Amino acid sequence: LGNHEIGYLDRKTSDLYGELKKAGAVVLEKNYEDIKVKNHTIRIGGLYEYAFAVDGQGKMSKKDMNSGLRDFLMDFEDTKAFKIMMSHRPDSFIFGQAADTWKIDLVVSGHAHGGQVILPGMGGLYGADQGWFPKYVDGIHHFRTVKNMIVTRGLGSDKEKLPRFNNIPEIVVIDLKK
């Protein structure tokens, strides 16, 4: 789920979960499913919250996390299967050293709309939650334990802050190969 869907849930204007399930969708918010593809297991999870908590010295601290979130992430990474986490906000893993803490093969993310405005030779101008001239607004990024993070520019725009300019919308297709 993204921030717009979370907003619908907060306003309680509709039974979004019920409508999604009725349409056949599987909602993976702090949840995961193991699926079989050509005799290989892939674990797919979903997370909107931040995947970190910071202690008094500014370091990643699993013990300071909300226990439900910590337990979900520890359970999610406890498999030999290939692990894909869908996390709307890339900052869920880039802040607080979370990308160097959790053992996840691939995080798929968006939220920053490619930086809204792309300046030639400089990249994205503004990324939600990352601020001005953000690093993680599109492309593939690698970390110590989160092996790959793909951040898509997506299709939308944050028209309240900046209109999308010089920033071609995208849908990312990922081919997984053994």
Positions of the model-derived regions?
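Solvent-exposed loop/turn segments at secondary-structure junctions
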Residues: 3-8, 33-35, 49-52, 89-93, ...
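Binuclear metal-dependent hydrolase catalytic cores centered on His/Asp/Glu-rich metal-binding motifs
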Residues: 22-24, 37-83, 93, 161-164
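Divalent metal-coordination and catalytic microenvironments
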Residues: 2, 27, 44, 88, ...
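Short beta-strand-to-coil "C-cap" segments at the C-terminal boundary of structured domains/repeats
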Residues: 174-178
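Short acidic-hydrophobic surface loop/beta-edge motif
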Residues: 31-38, 139-145
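Core catalytic region of metal-dependent phosphoesterases/phosphodiesterases
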Residues: 1-36
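Active-site beta-strand/loop signature of hydrolases that rely on acidic residues for catalysis
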Residues: 1-4, 82-88, 105-108
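Conserved beta-sheet core of the metallophosphoesterase superfamily
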Residues: 90-172
